[in-house]
């Protein structure tokens, strides 16, 4: 019995010590450093409106369907962050072809003057997460004609808006040149008022 207690006592102490260190101390230290060094990122890169209300995140895409606004990528999960993921069909899967054809048909209804051959792939395919907040500058540019026609905002103004909101590759190396759809639409909304 005494031998059993002598073995259990250090095991219990070590378990409790690591529980406190890994479950409490480490997360608090990491959170504290993140809040001090990069508060915006640590809080989820939230975007606020003029009333200081959260309207979205720079990191999570939103579904824009109003033809006056720029549209983002297709999302098979309808931009529900808790369901992050995508079907990620193989190129040989007939379901991928059906999904892309459906996206192209929807595109043609909203943008009848833009030839299908000019539609960038990111407007008719899912991202891996289904939550991608960005599109390519070309994907934004092919929507200019529709938005200009509906809103009477000159194409030159919309193209400048895209240029102003275009972000380069991270550190000049990682990723692609991109436009955050939510930020772009917030700037567009200022012109619509």
From Swiss-Prot:
Highest taxon above the source species: Bacteria
MF terms in GO: ATP binding; P-type potassium transmembrane transporter activity
Chief localization: membrane
Entry keyword Membrane: yes
Keyword entries, A-Z: ATP-binding, Cell membrane, Ion transport, Membrane, Nucleotide-binding, Potassium, Potassium transport, Transmembrane, Transmembrane helix, Transport
Subcellular location: Cell membrane
Functional description taken from the UniProt entry: Part of the high-affinity ATP-driven potassium transport (or Kdp) system, which catalyzes the hydrolysis of ATP coupled with the electrogenic transport of potassium into the cytoplasm. This subunit acts as a catalytic chaperone that increases the ATP-binding affinity of the ATP-hydrolyzing subunit KdpB by the formation of a transient KdpB/KdpC/ATP ternary complex.
UniProt family annotation: Belongs to the KdpC family.
Family annotation (PANTHER family): POTASSIUM-TRANSPORTING ATPASE C CHAIN (PTHR30042), POTASSIUM-TRANSPORTING ATPASE KDPC SUBUNIT (PTHR30042:SF2)
Listed name of the protein: Potassium-transporting ATPase KdpC subunit
Organism of provenance: Bacillus cereus (strain ATCC 10987 / NRS 248)
């Amino acid at each position: 019995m005494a031998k059993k207690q002598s073995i259990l006592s250090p095991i219990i102490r070590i378990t409790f010590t690591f529980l406190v260190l890994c479950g409490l101390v480490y997360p608090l230290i990491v959170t504290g450093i993140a809040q001090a060094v990069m508060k915006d990122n640590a809080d989820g890169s939230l975007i606020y409106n003029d009333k200081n209300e959260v309207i979205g995140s720079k990191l999570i895409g939103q579904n824009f369907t109003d033809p006056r606004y720029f549209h983002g990528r297709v999302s098979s999960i309808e931009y529900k962050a808790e369901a992050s993921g995508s079907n990620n069909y193989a190129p040989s899967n007939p379901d991928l072809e059906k999904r892309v054809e459906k996206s192209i048909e929807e595109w043609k209804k909203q943008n009848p003057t833009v030839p299908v051959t000019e539609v960038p792939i990111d407007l008719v395919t899912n991202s891996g997460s289904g939550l991608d907040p960005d599109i390519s500058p070309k994907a934004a540019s092919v929507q200019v004609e529709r938005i200009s026609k509906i809103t009477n905002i000159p194409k030159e103004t919309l193209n400048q808006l895209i240029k102003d909101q275009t972000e380069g590759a991270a550190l000049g190396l990682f990723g692609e040149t991109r436009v955050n759809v939510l930020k772009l639409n917030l700037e567009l909304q200022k012109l619509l008022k």
